[in-house]
Amino acid sequence: MTGEDLTVVIDVPRGSFIKRDDDGAVDFFSPIPCPFNYGHVPGTLADDGDALDAVVLGAKLPLGSTVTVTTRARVDFIDAGCHDPKWVCADTPLSGVQRRRVAGFFRVYALGKRFINAVRGKKGSTRYLGWL
């Protein structure tokens, strides 16, 4: 489905330290700012019971804004044992630098999510698996 347009609701604007759930509730505070806009695709469902996630590259977008963006790639991610892939969206095809930044972000994000899941008593592996 890369190259197709998706509607994404922004839950975490670029530069934000606050990760929110699809309903807007605060999920956690990050020690580092999110380097990308991060949101969800309404009307979809991932294995974790939440809507599919999407990263939107580019300028900072307002919290709660709805944007139509082009899918450029997809990363494979496991969160507390549940398959939780993420769409990567941008106006133009991804450069090598952008791909490395996204991969690096999800490697670090997986470490943080492992800690959060352990504190919350969630079982199962949490890890970044690479590009789909």
Where are these regions (language model features)?
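Hydrophobic N-terminal alpha-helices or hydrophobic patches in metabolic proteins across all domains
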Residues: M1-L132
